[in-house]
């Protein structure tokens, strides 16, 4: 078996990492806000795609650039290290409200200088009434606004941040280079017919792409010039040589395809960076990096030996730390659902390729190098994912477990055995299905060929819909009734449990439809107001169709719905079925009163203990609850299938919805807005995250958990089925334990058809100490949901949620 070196970092990489993790309250950068405002004001006569292209070009030409930390990969998002840019075209309302309190937010604090406050107070008023968020609220119906105000449905993220959740076509970029991409645009423009309305709009889009690609080239040359200037003043010969190489790399990739591994990695990083300058959307991912960079790695490391493996790993480390520098500021409410300010920049390795119609294992030496580099660095970025398949070698699986044992929540593992065949059933070409990658948290898509948002825009609070089901359609938190129904526990008029399920079906269909209606508004406003030019240029077939992704330019376009509180739904329904209807141990009105009073008082607390201990819980391989949850969830899946997204019929294959379970950290704020539930959960406490069991309810070990998850209709939940498991570090101390985990992984994926799994390998005691002494644990990384975060950067509520999760042994 290959033994990875997992305890080695070069001095400069260690210093760079420590410098970043000790930035507790990063600054805000207003350069982008100022530059975009200037260009929008100057070019009001231009079509929006051209206006946005000119704004991005102006910003790339004028913004502050720097090279620090003896880095080998260069490029900064903002004027200061880890500073978060402001994107006023999406929203200014929360910025103006929260600007003076940003430093005091728990787990998501930012420092704002007086000068930056002055700039924001200067630029924000101009944007009032014309941001994406403002225009969404101008289009929402009163009913939609009321639903959003209650928080049963939450859709703030895309109104205030944009889309993303995709990987662009890095292989095409590497093949053609920036000049080659401009030539592709020029050829398409040569076939434009300006007497055709669609082509008239298409010409403006293609013109915008050319402006942006030229700006990206010039931006690369700015870094080349800076590196040369720094080299002249550098006294260390080795660093001077590195700076000159950086300059040469940046000059070459400004126009030509890269020739070396270093150049290829630099070009990919520049694009990754500028995508996150163009748009504030997160989960911009690299796709299958071990596949498209391997030819360069093979040439430099294996054949010509112009670069040794350790040098290649240091280049990867430099790239990973540059990803960690990228930052994003969210509103106070949105930051609670994305605890730890994550960017979800996913890198996928492993899996299979389709060669002459036959699947072949895709693992190569770069797969191991990327895996090892992440294991050594133990950072939150990139979000590393491994594609598992039945033919994966024990050697590579063993290497993955070695890194899992490092305890930073990576790699997450996705399952080819379910994703690929289900993608092919959808209508994805087999060659593309075998080329899928993890996106953001656990979502999956085909890099460079899939539209935005392979995961949904809005979250539905399943627990609150369930409570409305039990109480005449009344939302227990707000008191509002959106879909009235006859039956209510407080009336004692449910004749049987079948009526409960029937009312659930009606309620979840209503809320699902309303979430799609809301997404339609947001999608439309994003399409009309914030064309993402560079991103569209690097997704097939946007150039050929002369359409942005939002206009239907992508080859594929499916979107998943999202929800929070899956396990709470199953556990609550199971408790009601068994204790109220099957046994008659608890009366309908008795339960309604206990829930309304949050189990206050001795009698209600005794009832609560019966709900907790006397009813089955999801995660323990109990069919009575697992199958009930699957049945309730199936209604949601079936309803989603009824709808098309706004790109349907406009070009892409697909254009439909399917389910997904990535709840990020929304289970904590959603729980804070949810009253007591029949599973015994108290009001205002966290809900279950993803498809994982509710904290503390999975008592029979990890094997029982994976069996329960496998009973969900995973083949229909193509947006991903997120399973977090927490293991005590002592569980993986010896070779025998490692083998147990490997067997568990193979069983989960091959027998139970699991979609995804990830592990926290950290003890409760360590987490409690880190909460008590944060300065001593700044580099402690934990798995939150489909992403990892620095534990001390999380809010206390999210820290407590992670501490409370069940700690298993093998």
Explain the meaning of each model-derived region.
Residues 221, 225-228, 574, 807:
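Short amphipathic alpha-helical segments enriched in leucine
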């Amino acid at each position: 078996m290959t033994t990875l070196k997992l305890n080695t970092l070069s001095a400069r990489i260690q210093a760079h990492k420590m410098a970043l993790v000790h930035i507790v309250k990063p600054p805000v950068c207003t350069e982008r806000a100022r530059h975009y405002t200037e260009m929008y004001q100057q070019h009001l006569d231009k079509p929006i795609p051209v206006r946005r292209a000119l704004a991005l070009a102006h910003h790339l030409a004028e913004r502050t650039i720097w090279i620090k930390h003896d880095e080998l990969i260069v490029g900064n998002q903002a004027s200061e290290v880890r500073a978060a840019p402001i994107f006023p075209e999406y929203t200014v309302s929360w910025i103006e409200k929260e600007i003076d309190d940003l430093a005091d937010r728990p787990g998501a604090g930012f420092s704002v200088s007086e000068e930056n406050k002055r700039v924001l107070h200067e630029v924000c008023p101009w944007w009032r009434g014309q941001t994406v968020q403002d225009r969404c609220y101008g289009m929402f119906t009163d009913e939609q606004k009321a639903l959003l105000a209650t928080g049963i449905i939450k859709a703030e993220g895309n109104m205030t941040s944009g889309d993303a959740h995709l990987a662009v076509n890095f292989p095409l970029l590497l093949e053609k280079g920036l000049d080659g991409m401009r030539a592709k645009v020029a050829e398409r423009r040569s076939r434009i017919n300006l007497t055709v309305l669609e082509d008239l709009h298409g010409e403006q889009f293609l013109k915008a792409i050319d402006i942006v690609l030229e700006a990206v080239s010039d931006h690369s040359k700015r870094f080349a010039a800076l590196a040369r200037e720094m080299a002249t003043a550098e006294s260390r010969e080795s660093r001077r040589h590195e700076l000159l190489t950086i300059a040469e790399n940046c000059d070459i990739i400004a126009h030509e395809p890269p020739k070396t591994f270093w150049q290829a990695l630099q070009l990919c990083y520049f694009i990754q960076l500028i995508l996150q300058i163009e748009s504030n959307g997160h989960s911009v991912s690299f796709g299958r990096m071990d596949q498209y960079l391997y030819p360069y790695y093979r040439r430099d490391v294996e054949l010509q030996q112009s670069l040794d493996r350790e040098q290649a790993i240091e280049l990867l480390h430099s790239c990973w730390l540059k990803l960690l520098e990228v930052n994003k500021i969210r509103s106070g409410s949105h930051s609670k659902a994305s605890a730890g300010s994550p960017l979800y920049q996913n890198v996928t390795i492993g899996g299979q390729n389709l060669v002459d119609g036959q699947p072949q294992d895709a693992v190569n030496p770069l797969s191991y190098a990327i895996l090892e580099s992440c294991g050594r660095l133990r950072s939150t970025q990139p979000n590393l994912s491994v594609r598992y398949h039945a033919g994966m070698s024990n050697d590579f699986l063993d290497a993955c477990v070695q890194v899992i044992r490092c305890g930073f929540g990576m790699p997450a593992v996705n399952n080819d055995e379910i994703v690929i065949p289900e993608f092919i059933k959808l209508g994805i070409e087999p060659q593309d299905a075998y080329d899928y990658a993890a996106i953001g948290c656990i979502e999956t898509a085909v890099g460079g060929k899939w539209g935005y948002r392979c995961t949904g825009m809005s979250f539905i609070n399943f627990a609150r819909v369930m409570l409305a089901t039990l109480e005449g359609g009344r939302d227990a938190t707000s008191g509002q009734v959106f879909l009235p129904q006859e039956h209510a526990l407080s009336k004692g008029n449910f004749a049987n449990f079948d009526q409960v399920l029937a009312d659930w079906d009606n309620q979840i269909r209503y809320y699902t439809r309303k979430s799609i209606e809301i997404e339609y508004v947001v999608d439309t406003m994003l399409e009309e107001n914030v064309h993402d030019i560079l991103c569209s240029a690097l997704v097939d077939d946007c150039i050929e169709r002369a359409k942005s992704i939002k206009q239907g330019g992508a080859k594929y376009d499916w979107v998943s719905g999202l929800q929070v509180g899956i396990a709470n739904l199953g556990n609550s329904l199971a408790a009601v079925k068994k204790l109220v209807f099957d046994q008659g141990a608890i009366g309908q009105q008795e339960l309604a009163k206990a829930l309304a009073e949050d189990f206050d008082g001795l009698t209600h607390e005794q009832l609560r203990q019966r709900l907790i201990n006397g009813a089955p819980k999801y995660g323990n391989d109990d069919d009575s609850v697992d199958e009930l949850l699957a049945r309730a969830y199936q209604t949601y899946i079936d309803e989603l299938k009824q709808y098309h997204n706004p790109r349907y019929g406009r070009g892409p294959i697909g254009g439909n919805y399917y389910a997904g379970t990535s709840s990020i950290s929304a289970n904590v704020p959603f729980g804070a807005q949810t009253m007591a539930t029949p599973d015994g959960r108290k009001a205002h406490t966290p809900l279950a995250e993803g498809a994982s069991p509710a904290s503390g309810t999975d008592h029979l070990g990890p094997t029982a958990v994976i069996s329960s998850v496998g009973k969900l209709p995973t083949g229909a939940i193509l947006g991903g089925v997120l399973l977090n498991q927490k293991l005590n570090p002592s569980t993986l101390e010896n070779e025998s334990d490692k083998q147990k985990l490997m067997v568990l992984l193979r069983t989960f994926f091959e027998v139970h058809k699991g979609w995804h799994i990830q592990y926290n390998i950290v003890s409760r005691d360590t987490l409690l100490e880190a909460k008590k002494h944060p300065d001593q644990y700044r580099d402690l990384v934990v798995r939150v949901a489909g992403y990892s975060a620095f534990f001390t950067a999380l809010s206390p509520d999210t820290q407590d949620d992670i501490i409370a999760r069940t700690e298993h042994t093998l």
